[in-house]
Regions:
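Conserved alpha-helical "signature site"
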Residues: 1-161, 174-258, 295-299
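Terminal helices and disordered tails flanking the catalytic cores of nucleotide-processing hydrolases
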Residues: 1-13, 258-300
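Short glycine/proline- and charge-enriched loop/turn segments
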Residues: 166-176
C-alpha cells in the first residue's frame, strides 16, 4: 500500500481526525512534574492535594495492609515519600482512565488499558536494568497499543470485527494479522499514523509502528532499542496473562525464556542471568500494582 492509500485507509477506519479522551488536566500536570528531576515531594503533594479523589486514594493505599506501616500516615508529603513518585504516577493514571471509560465498553477497554499500563511498567523495568531510557521506555510501552484504543473509541464495530475474527482463528494468527485481514490496517499502523497527525516526535511513530516486528540489529539506535524493549515487554505481558483482548492467548503457559528469541535478548543487551533478574522484578512489580488497583476498586 502506497503512502496516499495508507492515509486514505486510516481516515476511513478512524472516521476523520484521530481523537482520544483527554487525561484530566491535573494528571497531565502531575506527570510532567514527576518527570522533573528538580521536583520535590512537597511540590507533588501540592498538586495531589488539589484533587480529593487522588488525595484520598494516596492516603488509603499508604495506610493499607499492602504497605504494612505500623503507624497511620495523614501527611500527604510523607505518604508520597513512602510510596515513591512512580507509584503516585500509577495511581493518578489509574484514576483518570477509570473515570474516562464509558459503561458500554468498560470491560474490554479496562483490559486494554491494563495491558498498556503493565507493558509500560515492564518496559520501564527492562530499560532500567539496562541503565538506558527507562522513562522513555515506560511512555512507549504505555502508548504501544494506542492504535487499538483509538480504533475502539473511533470505530468500535471495526474493532469488534477484527477481534471476533481473531477469536474465531483460535490462536492460528496474531491479533494484528487479524486486523490486517479484516480492516486493512493494523493497530500498530493506526497508532503510528496517529502519532504523525498529533505531531509527536518521530521516535513515537517508529517505535509504535514497529513494536510487533522490531528491526534486527544492535540496539545503539534509540528507535531500534525502544522497539525491541517494548516488543519484549508486550510479549511478556501476554505471557503473564495480561492480554489486551479477551481471547485465546498464544503466549500463555510458555516459559518466558523459551518464548523470547535469544537473538533479540542479546541484541537488546540482556544476558540470561540479567533476564531472570528482570522477570523477578516484573513479577514483584505487577503483583504489587495489581493489589493496589484491586484495593482502589474495592474501597471506592
Amino acid at each position: 500500500m502506497n503512502q496516499e492509500d495508507l492515509w486514505k485507509r486510516f481516515y476511513a477506519v478512524v472516521g476523520g481526525e484521530p481523537q482520544l479522551y483527554a487525561l484530566k488536566q491535573i494528571v497531565t500536570y502531575l506527570l510532567n512534574l514527576i518527570a522533573d528531576p528538580k521536583a520535590s515531594s512537597k511540590d507533588i503533594a501540592r498538586v495531589v492535594s488539589s484533587d480529593p479523589a487522588l488525595s484520598a486514594n494516596v492516603l488509603k493505599i499508604v495506610n493499607s495492609p499492602i504497605i504494612g506501616l505500623r503507624n497511620k500516615v495523614s501527611d500527604l508529603v510523607l505518604a508520597i515519600s513512602l510510596l515513591g513518585y512512580n507509584q503516585i504516577r500509577d495511581i493518578a493514571l489509574e484514576i483518570s482512565v477509570s473515570q474516562a471509560l464509558n459503561a458500554k465498553q468498560n470491560a474490554q477497554m479496562m483490559r486494554l488499558w491494563k495491558h498498556s499500563f503493565y507493558c509500560g511498567k515492564i518496559s520501564e523495568i527492562i530499560a532500567a536494568s539496562l541503565g538506558r531510557m527507562a522513562g522513555e521506555a515506560f511512555t512507549m510501552g504505555l502508548l504501544h497499543d494506542i492504535g487499538k484504543i483509538l480504533l475502539a473509541y473511533a470505530n468500535y464495530d471495526a474493532f469488534e470485527t477484527s477481534l471476533n475474527n481473531y477469536r474465531y482463528q483460535r490462536g492460528k494468527v496474531l491479533h494484528w494479522q487479524s486486523e490486517q485481514a479484516t480492516i486493512g490496517l493494523t493497530h500498530a499502523e493506526i497508532g503510528g499514523l496517529a502519532c504523525v497527525r498529533w505531531q509527536l516526535p518521530d521516535l513515537f511513530y517508529r517505535v509504535i509502528w514497529y513494536h510487533h516486528v522490531p528491526p534486527a540489529g544492535n540496539s545503539k539506535s534509540e528507535e531500534i532499542y525502544l522497539s525491541q524493549v517494548v516488543h519484549l515487554a508486550d510479549t511478556l505481558c501476554w505471557n503473564l496473562n495480561h492480554p489486551s483482548v479477551n481471547s485465546v492467548n498464544p503466549y500463555s503457559g510458555q516459559k518466558p525464556e523459551t518464548l523470547l528469541s535469544e537473538n533479540l535478548l542479546a541484541e537488546v543487551g540482556l544476558s540470561k542471568g540479567r533476564f531472570q533478574d528482570v522477570l523477578t522484578k516484573v513479577n514483584e512489580s505487577l503483583k504489587t500494582t495489581e493489589l493496589i488497583f484491586n484495593f482502589m476498586k474495592s474501597s471506592n
